[in-house]
Amino acid sequence: MEFSVLMSVYYKENPEYLKLSLDSVIKQTVSAAEIVLIKDGPLTKELDDIINQYSDKYAGLFRVFSLEENVGLGKALNYGVQRCKYDLIARMDTDDIVVPERFELQVNEFIKDKELVLCGGYIAEFARDPLIISGYRRVPLTQAAILKFAKKRNPFNHMTVMSV
């Protein structure tokens, strides 16, 4: 089952986090068919250099699109969704590091349940050092719990979502 990974980066992103994030996407046990990276406005030279290095090293995997000015995460992602080649899209933030099995686990859920339209998961958060976990963000897992939770706030950790 082929899918796209959608990411948006802007000038304030930490270059080291971007590298760690891209490495974690590339080292998945199930590979994405494409990584759609939206440059949300002009970036620093260091961020541009990292994106160019990965685009060159993994030619054909990365599809990079540039917005002339920063429009914010929501609009940048909407722009990116329109450029994804596949109906199934995995979201990633450029400061997130995912476990190697994330895409495999999610794709398997879509294979098992043909009516599934979205799945996500918990996150472990860090402040500066990815090896030092500062907390966890757990979300409801059942449909009933999701519907109840959604009355108060978003029941999904958006950066963990894979959806059609």
Provide a role label for each language-model segment:
Residues 1-164:
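Nucleotide-sugar donor-binding/catalytic module of glycosyltransferases
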